[in-house]
């Protein structure tokens, strides 16, 4: 993290404004000022030095209600995600932001997107979503989670990945216990303990289902169990345990890769109308113990292009980037 975020956290914990003043003083104006003017001056800069700074700008904005700094953080996110990232949700070559109009180095370097970058971009994405509940943030969160973060741990030995090369037919290097303690090992340990943090969201009487991951949630007196084989299964089911009947709304995210018109929603096996609003399909009722609500998530094969418009493509099925073998 960045020092500005640390001091902002201390200010929040202690209630002392002098720490918030320090947080602003430790905010790097060379990066912040162009963002305030919606200018992208990131080319050539060390990527994971800048992302924690912006997390700090957002943290300060949240504590002080600073709309300008909040907007700067959003502009940075939009710039990196829409103009400087590839299909797996990662960014940077050899740890640095390359020219946004030229991704050729991304396709040839053995040092492609850095895991730490995506770790911190997911932290920023979480903060932005918590402010606005815009499903666009969750679409990008899901893409990076499944295609970059999930793939950065060795499923046998448990090593972690520093770089994910985008070179066709290339390989990745995993950390070794006695010889490798890169930055991406430290953040990597956190990555794989955080899969549950953005599955659900809530307001007073609304439960948001943002990610389709098998999980159990205790929401007040309501127990929610999500049952799914996603992404191998194109559906998810919620099983509710309420004790006493309770009225609330369940809102499922409509992913960018799915077609709301083809979705099917059932409650206890009975079809329900499917109407998407604000990026969510909602079902409101008085829920009873043992109720089940199931949503189908039709997937299709599609092509993802690079932001520079070059003739290079990734094939995706649903949210997942496909690989050949």
Cite the ranges covered by each PLM segment.
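Glycan-recognition and catalytic cores of secretory/periplasmic carbohydrate-active enzymes
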Residues: 1-325
């Amino acid at each position: 993290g960045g020092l500005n975020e640390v001091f902002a956290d201390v200010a929040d914990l202690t209630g002392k404004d002098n720490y918030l003043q320090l947080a602003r003083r430790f905010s790097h104006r060379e990066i912040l000022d162009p963002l305030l003017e919606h200018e992208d001056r990131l080319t050539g800069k060390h990527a994971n030095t800048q992302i924690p700074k912006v997390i700090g700008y957002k943290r300060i904005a949240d504590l002080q209600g600073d709309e300008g700094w909040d907007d700067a953080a959003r502009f940075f996110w939009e710039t990196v995600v829409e103009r400087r990232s590839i299909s797996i949700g990662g960014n940077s070559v050899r740890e640095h932001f390359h020219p946004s109009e030229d991704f050729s180095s991304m396709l040839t370097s053995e040092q492609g997107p850095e895991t730490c970058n995506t770790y911190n971009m997911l932290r920023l994405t979480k903060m932005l979503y918590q402010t606005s509940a815009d499903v666009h943030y969750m679409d990008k969160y899901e893409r990076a989670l499944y295609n970059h973060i999930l793939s950065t741990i060795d499923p046998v030995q448990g090593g972690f990945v520093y770089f994910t090369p985008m070179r066709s037919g290339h390989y990745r290097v995993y950390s070794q216990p006695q010889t490798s303690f890169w930055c991406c090992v430290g953040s990597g340990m956190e990555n794989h303990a955080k899969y549950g943090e953005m599955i659900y969201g809530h307001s007073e009487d609304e439960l948001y289902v943002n990610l389709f991951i098998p999980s159990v949630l205790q929401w007040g007196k309501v127990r929610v169990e999500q049952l799914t084989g996603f992404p191998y299964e194109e559906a998810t089911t919620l099983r509710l345990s309420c004790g006493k009947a309770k009225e609330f709304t369940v809102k499922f995210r409509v992913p960018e890769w799915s077609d709301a018109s083809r979705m099917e929603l059932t409650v206890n096996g009975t079809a329900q109308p499917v109407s998407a609003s604000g990026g969510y399909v909602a079902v409101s009722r008085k829920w009873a113990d043992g109720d089940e609500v199931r949503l189908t998530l039709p997937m299709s094969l599609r092509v993802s292009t690079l932001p520079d418009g070059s003739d290079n493509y990734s094939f995706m099925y649903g949210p997942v980037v496909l690989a050949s073998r």
